[in-house]
């Protein structure tokens, strides 16, 4: 009867941390811009615009005091907009921008502490050495190669966003029971929600969701996704259990949801009583796999199309009743794997079917056996990559290379280094593609864009510049994969490099997707 209660409180009981006093500790802000925090488990370094990247305890204390003043943040924007050409008011407008960064950065740093400690302790308990190796994005693809070839249907899920910031705070409240800290966070989100509304009417940028402030909001969003995945795992386990229980046992289990008390998710229990009991046993599927990436998710199953539709509407009800998030049916697409290609982490993935006939000879009789083998295939989406290059001003939308005027002030070595780094990163990331020849076009665009940029800097034509500099200037853009592999594998290693342009090599040191392959 207490299975759900124990499952939901299993991890939350550890989160009895008091975070509010940490806002007034000097060492927190010394760690904030330390190299150790820059290499944090969760995030990349955040660059604060117009600031020397040194947080101050005194400034934070003053900001916390002032933020409780009525309409303090909005008044700064109003004062600055009355006369933009007055230096004092311009400083006030910049101060509102800077204050939002300071407060959000402080929240993000402190709220990460208990969860990073919990993650480290988890791997220590499981005795998993070097858990940072598990962060590789490419580790997902070998998993898909092993699992998807045996499945039939896949659902592309676009995870909905919460319509109100209070939902995020309430979810966090179930895990961190620190009233002052949550109250300040709620007040901060409320004030900047009003500030955003004011800035939208004035056709200005939204500071809260800007690049400088994305750290704390990315944490809250990821935590919201983690919460519904946490409950989804429970639903999945119950659906797997139901296929092994008798009908009498199932009728007894339908009442244990109503008997649970003293939980922080009473609303979830009410939802279960309303629709969960009627739909759960329809969704039993022993072969189901779930992968989430960049605000999207993939749910693959060996079941029928009807079963996938039942899971689809269960998600809709779950989001609506528990998270108060309204989701449209177009957010989930159900497709058959054998006839569908889906874009996944910079690759165009599909399930290829290979038909073959085997002649079997038995005594005087012979007969043919038709066999079908499935293979998970990943190719480079050249059209999407060209679109990303066009957006970054390396080429036109049709793929015609152009110069990069903003880089002409750099030295020749810096220009070559930047273009070469982009080219190597793309080749490194797409090393698992089954058709790497398509990368040659991307390399050609970058090579010619680099030549045009250097020629523009020296006020010359591309042909004249290359004739004067030598043909070997841009050879690094066409570094063969064999040369890269020869640096990784020792000569004594029996590794066949011949034909490696057809080999699929997944590098397990890539922890985040490259900006140029992020098309979402």
From Swiss-Prot:
Q: Which family does it belong to?
A: Belongs to the intron maturase 2 family. MatK subfamily.
Q: Which UniProt keywords apply?
A: Chloroplast, mRNA processing, Plastid, RNA-binding, tRNA processing
Q: What does this protein do?
A: Usually encoded in the trnK tRNA gene intron. Probably assists in splicing its own and other chloroplast group II introns.
UniProt xrefs under InterPro entries:
Domain_X, Maturase_MatK, Maturase_MatK_N
Example of a GO cellular component annotation carried by this entry:
chloroplast
- Cellular localization per UniProt: Plastid, Chloroplast
Kindly give the Pfam families that the UniProt entry links to this protein.
Intron_maturas2 (PF01348), MatK_N (PF01824)
Main location per the UniProt record: plastid
Q: What protein name applies here?
A: Maturase K
Write down the HAMAP family for this protein, in alphabetical order: MatK
Biological processes annotated in GO:
mRNA processing; RNA splicing; tRNA processing
Q: Which GO terms describe its molecular function?
A: RNA binding
What domain of life? Eukaryota
């Amino acid at each position: 009867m207490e299975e759900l209660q124990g499952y939901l409180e299993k991890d939350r009981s550890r989160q009895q941390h008091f975070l509010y006093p940490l806002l007034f500790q000097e060492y927190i802000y010394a760690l904030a811009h330390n190299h150790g925090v820059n290499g944090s488990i969760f995030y990349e370094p955040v660059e604060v615009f117009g600031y020397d990247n040194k947080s101050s305890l005194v400034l934070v204390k003053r900001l916390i005091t002032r933020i409780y003043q009525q309409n303090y943040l909005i008044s700064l924007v109003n004062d600055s907009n009355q006369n933009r050409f007055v230096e004092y008011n311009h400083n006030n407008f910049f101060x509102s921008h800077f204050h939002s960064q300071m407060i959000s950065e402080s929240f993000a740093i402190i709220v990460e502490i208990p969860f990073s400690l919990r993650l480290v302790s988890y791997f220590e308990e499981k005795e998993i050495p070097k858990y940072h190796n598990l962060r590789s994005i490419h580790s997902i693809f070998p998993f898909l190669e092993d699992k998807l070839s045996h499945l039939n249907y896949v659902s592309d899920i676009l995870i909905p966003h919460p319509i109100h910031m209070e939902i995020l705070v309430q979810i966090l409240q179930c895990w961190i029971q620190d009233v002052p800290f949550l109250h300040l966070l709620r007040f901060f989100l409320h004030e900047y929600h009003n500030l955003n509304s004011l800035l939208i009417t004035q056709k200005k940028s939204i500071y809260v969701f800007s690049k400088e402030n994305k750290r704390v909001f990315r944490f809250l969003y990821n935590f919201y996704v983690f919460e519904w995945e946490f409950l989804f795992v429970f639903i999945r386990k119950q659906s797997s259990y139901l296929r092994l229980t008798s009908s009498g046992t199932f009728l007894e289990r339908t009442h244990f949801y109503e008997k649970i008390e003293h939980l922080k998710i009473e609303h979830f229990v009410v939802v279960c009583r309303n629709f969960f009991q009627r739909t759960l046993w329809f969704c039993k599927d022993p072969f189901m796999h779930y992968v989430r990436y960049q605000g999207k998710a993939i749910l693959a199953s060996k079941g029928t199309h009807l079963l996938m539709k039942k899971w689809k509407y269960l998600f809709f009800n779950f989001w609506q009743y528990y998270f108060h998030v309204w989701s449209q049916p177009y957010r989930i697409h159900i497709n058959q794997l054998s006839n569908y290609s889906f874009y996944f982490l910079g690759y165009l993935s599909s399930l290829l079917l290979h038909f073959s006939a085997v002649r079997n000879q038995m005594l005087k009789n012979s007969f043919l056996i038709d066999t079908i083998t499935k293979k998970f295939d990943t190719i480079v989406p050249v059209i999407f990559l060209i679109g990303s290059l066009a957006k970054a001003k390396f080429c036109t939308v049709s793929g015609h290379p152009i110069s990069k005027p903003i880089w002409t002030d750099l030295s020749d070595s810096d220009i070559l280094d930047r273009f070469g780094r982009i080219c190597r990163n793309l080749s490194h990331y797409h090393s698992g593609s089954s058709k790497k020849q398509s990368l040659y076009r991307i390399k050609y665009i970058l090579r010619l864009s680099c030549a045009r940029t250097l020629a523009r800097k020296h006020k010359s034509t591309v042909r004249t510049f290359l004739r004067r500099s030598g043909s070997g200037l841009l050879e690094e853009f066409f570094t063969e994969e064999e040369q890269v592999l020869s640096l990784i594998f020792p000569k004594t290693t029996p590794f066949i490099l011949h034909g490696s342009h057809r080999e699929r090599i997944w590098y397990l040191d890539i922890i985040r997707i490259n900006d140029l392959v992020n098309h979402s």
